From Swiss-Prot:
Residues 180-189, 198-209 have a biased composition (Low complexity). Belongs to the PIR protein family. It holds the Pfam family PIR1-like_C. Residues 1-21 form the signal peptide. Residues 133-143, 220-231 have a biased composition (Acidic residues). This is Probable cell wall mannoprotein PIR32. GO terms for cellular component: extracellular region; fungal-type cell wall.
Length: 422
């Protein structure tokens, strides 16, 4: 009788455990295979599946043209730089004078995250049709009117051309950046002096070779050379040369003219100024390369290893060209092998309702995509080979989706930004 009572209790207990595993993928399948089919269409080298730093995303809406159609935002072409960035007032500048320009700071439309893992973009005051309210109530709001105005000014500066951005950045550079430019100028001057010295040494070597050739012509004329050939052919041992004009016994040097080398102090061995080789080691070496060849060799040495040899793992070049100030609510993400994670180590995925959110430690049951994320060379977040997402209004904020779910959805791109303390 007791056995009959225990069996229903165990059955109910197992049903409770099964229902509590809502976030576990069905049948224990590997959720990392939940990738968009378009991942196969990604062009090699145009998408980066891993980033070595924490980043955020900023909404960049599509532009509505005169015909009522949405056009993709124009991506400004920025030359990537391998240099480390340093924060200076509101501008991020590279640490070398050869930097293509400063990184714009974006504080508007940055994506935030709430406690349950959903990602949102807060609506600004200018997003509403009617304003109002007490200004004192907005003192603690991250998106108050003052911050919005400052963000609008910065966004306006970001829309200017790269040349205007360079001019503006020159007005806000700190004293440390000016000192860095002076150091870079001194370094450039030193490099120019070294190149000048190398050219002078090359000219001296060329002049020395011309003098030697002229001396050879003075002592060895064409008639003497022909006489030597005839005399050597008539002798059984023709390994030694004898001139009619002057014997060559016990002459050590290259041209066989001891007087010439004594006059020019070449009767002794000398050390090479760079490699420490003796003169005899350079007798049959190839001529020294010209300055153009030396520059090409230096450029080849300075090239990354992946450009020298095929199959070598390429050096990392960051595709992120902008930065943003982060707060406690800012969405902070990492990207590793196509998988997004937030600061709580939850998985970035597209759930069954096509909403972009973070769940974990495993994706939500019924999730559509949980992998296949990347960053394009233009610094945009991509899912598969697509950089197009949708922001859909929901009260005082927007949610993000990979497909439009209602009429209040608008296409956007998600620009990746480095997160910094401000």
């Amino acid at each position: 009788m007791i056995h009959y009572l225990i069996f229903p209790i165990l059955l109910i207990f197992f049903q409770i455990i099964k229902s509590s595993g809502y976030y576990v993928p069905a049948n224990g399948d590997d959720w990392t295979i939940l990738k968009p089919p378009s991942c196969k269409n990604k062009l090699p080298g145009q998408y980066i599946d891993s980033l070595p730093f924490t980043f955020g995303i900023v909404v960049n809406p599509y532009i509505l043209n005169e015909d009522g159609d949405y056009e993709k935002p124009i991506v400004s072409k920025i030359k990537p730089s391998l240099t480390t960035t340093t924060f200076v007032t509101s501008i991020i500048t590279t640490s070398t004078a050869t930097a293509p320009g400063s990184k714009p700071t974006k504080t508007k439309d940055i994506i935030v995250q709430i406690h349950d893992g959903q990602v949102q973009k807060m609506k600004h005051k200018h997003d509403y049709s009617s304003g109002g309210g007490d200004d004192d109530d907005d003192d603690e709001d991250c998106f108050d009117e003052k911050n919005i105005d400052m963000a609008a000014k910065r966004d306006y500066q970001d829309m200017n051309t790269q040349e205007q951005a360079n001019e503006d950045s020159g007005q806000v550079l700190a004293e440390s950046d000016s000192h860095q430019q002076v150091v870079d100028q001194n370094q450039q001057i030193n490099e120019e002096e070294e190149e000048t010295q190398e050219q002078q040494m090359q000219e001296e070597n060329n002049n020395t070779n011309e003098i030697e050739d002229n001396k050879v012509q003075e002592f060895e004329t064409i008639e003497e050379i022909y006489d030597d050939i005839d005399n050597n052919e008539s002798r059984p041992n023709n390994s030694k040369k004898y001139h009619k004009k002057r014997p060559h016994n016990n002459y050590e040097n290259k041209h066989g003219h001891k007087d010439y080398h004594e006059d020019h102090h070449h009767n002794h061995r000398y050390k090479d100024h760079e490699n420490g080789h003796e003169e005899d080691d350079h007798k049959w070496n190839k001529p020294k390369p010209m300055p153009e060849q030396e520059e090409q060799e230096q450029e080849q040495e300075q090239k990354p290893k992946h450009e020298k040899s095929e199959g070598y793992e390429s050096e990392f070049v960051s595709p992120v060209y902008s930065v943003a100030c982060y707060t406690n609510s800012t969405l902070k993400m990492t990207l590793t092998d196509g998988i997004l994670r937030d600061s709580d180590d939850r998985i970035g995925c597209i759930v069954s309702g096509h909403q972009f959110q973070f769940d974990g430690p495993t994706p939500q049951h019924g999730a559509i995509y949980a992998a296949g994320w990347s960053v394009t060379k233009q610094g945009q977040l991509a899912l598969g080979d697509s950089t197009k997402f949708y922001q859909c209004a929901s009260g005082d904020f927007y949610n993000l989706y990979d497909e439009p779910i209602a009429f209040q959805c608008h296409p956007v791109t998600l620009d990746v930004v480095e997160l910094i303390e401000c």
